[in-house]
């Protein structure tokens, strides 16, 4: 019964209004308020501040600065295995596997469309059909910056409007097409192994998503927006393996997609595996 009520609430709640209100609180600079909020959050979720560049909780100008905190140099060493594909973020593997019949496995009999995930453009999604995907869920205590699994040249960024369902095991098992329904930012790259997509998926109370090249990516009008970054227009924008790609102001999920015969995921990783940014996610197929 509790689960049914929770899922019902997900459909009834004003997702964007709640998220924007919480976003305003997260940017509050009133000293006593932001300090209490940060201290409560760090204690509640057992955040490890020993690896943060700034360990003093009161030194952050607002909650979002704390939430998107930088780590000390060396806190996330990058796997140096030849051909390594790096994990883009701290968190847990939600699912990983093959993109079969144009769909990605979600949970418990649910799947979602790769074409819809990438903004509804079949041509954009075509290079990934029959390829591989990995979904990484970032919990509240995790480091919330997302990094490049491989070096790449940015080709296109797509803002896709949508709902802001909470992202957790319960919603994954009960909300059809969850990741293809939530607001998201699609980042498409060319790499030495072919096309790569990194999708930053929003969720309830995720006030915004940022990328290192565009800053805040939440257009005032909630309509799909595509921006190309080829050499003739805005580019090229090149990011090294392990470089920061973007960040969540209150977290959610990162999904990585590759084309067919590009990568093989690490055998020890399965749904539920805890991961850290920079560790081995998979290997390039030579």
Swiss-Prot record:
Cofactor binding remark: Binds 1 pyruvoyl group covalently per subunit.
Record's subcellular location: Cell membrane
The entry's keywords: Cell membrane, Decarboxylase, Lipid biosynthesis, Lipid metabolism, Lyase, Membrane, Phospholipid biosynthesis, Phospholipid metabolism, Pyruvate, Zymogen
Site location (Cleavage (non-hydrolytic)): 251-252
GO biological process: phosphatidylethanolamine biosynthetic process
Keyword Cell membrane: yes
InterPro entries reported for this sequence: PS_Dcarbxylase, PSD-B, PSD_type1_pro
One GO molecular-function entry: phosphatidylserine decarboxylase activity
E.C. designation(s): 4.1.1.65
Cofactor entry: pyruvate
Superkingdom of the source species: Bacteria
Reactions performed catalytically: a 1,2-diacyl-sn-glycero-3-phospho-L-serine + H(+) = a 1,2-diacyl-sn-glycero-3-phosphoethanolamine + CO2
Cystine pairs: none
One Gene Ontology term, aspect cellular component: plasma membrane
Membrane topology: Peripheral membrane protein
Pfam families xref list: PS_Dcarbxylase
Entry-annotated residues carrying Pyruvic acid (Ser): 252
Residues annotated as catalytic: 90 (charge relay system), 147 (charge relay system), 252 (charge relay system), 252 (schiff-base intermediate with substrate)
Post-translational modification remark: Is synthesized initially as an inactive proenzyme. Formation of the active enzyme involves a self-maturation process in which the active site pyruvoyl group is generated from an internal serine residue via an autocatalytic post-translational modification. Two non-identical subunits are generated from the proenzyme in this reaction, and the pyruvate is formed at the N-terminus of the alpha chain, which is derived from the carboxyl end of the proenzyme.
Family indicated by similarity: Belongs to the phosphatidylserine decarboxylase family. PSD-B subfamily. Prokaryotic type I sub-subfamily.
Described purpose of this protein according to its UniProt entry: Catalyzes the formation of phosphatidylethanolamine (PtdEtn) from phosphatidylserine (PtdSer).
Subunit composition and interactions: Heterodimer of a large membrane-associated beta subunit and a small pyruvoyl-containing alpha subunit.
The protein's name: Phosphatidylserine decarboxylase proenzyme
Taxonomic classification: Bacteria, Pseudomonadati, Pseudomonadota, Gammaproteobacteria, Pseudomonadales
Gene from which this protein is expressed: psd
């Amino acid at each position: 019964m509790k689960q049914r009520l929770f899922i019902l609430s997900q459909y009834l709640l004003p997702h964007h209004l709640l998220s924007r209100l919480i976003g305003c609180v997260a940017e509050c600079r009133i000293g006593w308020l932001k300090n209490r909020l940060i201290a409560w959050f760090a204690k509640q979720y057992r955040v490890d501040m020993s690896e943060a560049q700034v360990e003093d909780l009161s030194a952050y100008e607002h909650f979002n600065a704390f939430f998107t905190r930088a780590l000390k140099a060396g806190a996330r060493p990058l796997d140096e295995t030849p051909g390594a594909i790096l994990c883009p973020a701290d968190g847990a593997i939600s699912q990983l596997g093959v993109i079969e019949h144009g769909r990605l496995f979600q949970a418990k009999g649910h799947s979602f469309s790769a074409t819809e995930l990438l903004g509804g453009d079949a041509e954009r999604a075509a290079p990934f059909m029959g390829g591989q995907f990995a979904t990484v869920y970032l919990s509240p205590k995790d480091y919330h910056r997302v990094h490049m699994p491989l070096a790449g040249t940015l080709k296109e960024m797509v803002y896709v409007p949508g709902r802001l369902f909470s992202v957790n095991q319960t919603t994954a098992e009960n909300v059809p097409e969850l990741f293809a329904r939530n607001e998201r930012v699609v980042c498409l790259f060319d790499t030495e192994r072919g096309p790569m997509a990194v999708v930053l998926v929003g969720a309830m109370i995720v006030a915004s998503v940022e990328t290192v090249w565009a800053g805040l990516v939440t257009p005032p009008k909630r309509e799909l927006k595509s921006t190309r970054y080829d050499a003739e227009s805005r580019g090229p924008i090149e990011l090294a393996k392990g470089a920061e790609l973007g960040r969540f102001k209150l977290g959610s999920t990162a999904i990585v997609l590759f084309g067919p015969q590009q990568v093989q995921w690490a055998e020890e990783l399965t749904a539920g595996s805890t991961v850290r940014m920079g560790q081995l996610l998979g290997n390039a197929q030579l």
